Amino acid sequence: MDRRDPPGAFDFSRYLGMLQKQGHNFIRLWAWDSTTLDSRANGALGKPFVHHAAPQPWLRTGPGLALDGKPKFDLSKHNPAYFARLRSRVQEAGKRGIYVSVMLFEGWGMMHGGRERGSAPPGWPWRSHPFHKDNNVNGVNGDTDGDDRTGEVHSLAVPAANKVQAAYIRRVVDTVGDLKNVLYEVINEGGRRDWNRWVIETVRERERQRRVRHPIGLTGHGAERLADMLDGAADWVSPGRLDGYGDDPPAWSRERPSLLDTDHIWGVGGSADWVWKAFTRGHNPLFMDPYEGVVLDEPRERWEQVRAAMGHARALADRLDLAAMTPRNGLASTGYCLAEPGVAYVAYLPAGGQVVLNLVGISGTFRAEWVHPLTGARIAGPTVEGGAQRSLTAPFGGPAVVLMSLSRGTAQAALTPQRPSGAPRFAKARGRHEVASLSVRG
């Protein structure tokens, strides 16, 4: 995606190399339902021109021309180049130990971006959508209310569109379903509740036929709020600002993992401080990285700090038995603590200085290790005994992270660095979370 039409090549290998260098292990692989993005709808983050998105899942064969002057889509004919690139990119990420959340549909455009935002003309996403009646040769018309602004294709109101969507979903599963580093995302910030569940079931049905299973998630700021997303079939969810998950995210205690994404909080935003708060509150922090600033925002020094914090948090996560850990705000005086009581504690000190850890009723000897949240530097701390409140002081100024681990017995095995081998796996167990980085739209 870029301002050229057709878009220029995106150096995906270089991008993955940046993620790998930073120690990141996750991307959202964006879909874009329309053929354009008018990022003026993104306000200050946007660009003063229209972006073009290609390839699309369907061939443009005509007969006849679409609203953009190009051949109309034939929604009965999949585009082999689209699915070949999808598989290639997922495979390349897997070789680098990176999970890929394959986005099936994109909803921000029609649900938010096309509704008179910024200086972008209303309805731009719908007029460049393949399911617009003037853009395909199959007679599919997703605009049930006739406003020519927001097609109702992310609902069950258009059976002809749903039939095309089901065939596309099956093709995606057939394309990447054998790869172990795959997750699915129903739609970015969109989709009616019954349609979201229909998409999940369509994926599940195809996976049952193929005897495979991958996690499927729902993301916030669409037609559903968090309570709705949790009351359904999704394996993971991504809360948003409207549900109270912003600068100071509350602790996560749900069975389904939380992939807390800056996209659904600020768009491009966040800070190193937010990364560590989210991590010690039990979330998987994701960063919508503007990367080179081609689509949104610009390269900034503050984003380098976010990337660094993500990598250092992920490095610490790899040393822990996260499946056994849960957020326990009350065990640290700062209110940020991830713990397996009696075995391991990770506390974050946003203001640095001193933290008091509650080891009352806990026996054993613990050793402390300090981690600098921006550099990843590790400094050995004191050894303390359980059984009381214990105070620790950071050996450097500014924010700090401390790891307290039991220094004897079999529990020590939980703190041994684990070197991943082969394709990465996504663990669903409560409390298990991976610190990750989110792909740019490209």
Model-derived features: positions:
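Mature N-terminal, pre-catalytic/accessory segment of carbohydrate-active enzymes
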Residues: 1-13, 22, 412-442
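Extracellular glycoside hydrolase catalytic/binding regions
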Residues: 164-167, 176-308
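Flexible, charged surface loops at secondary-structure boundaries
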Residues: 21, 229-232, 253, 338-341, ...
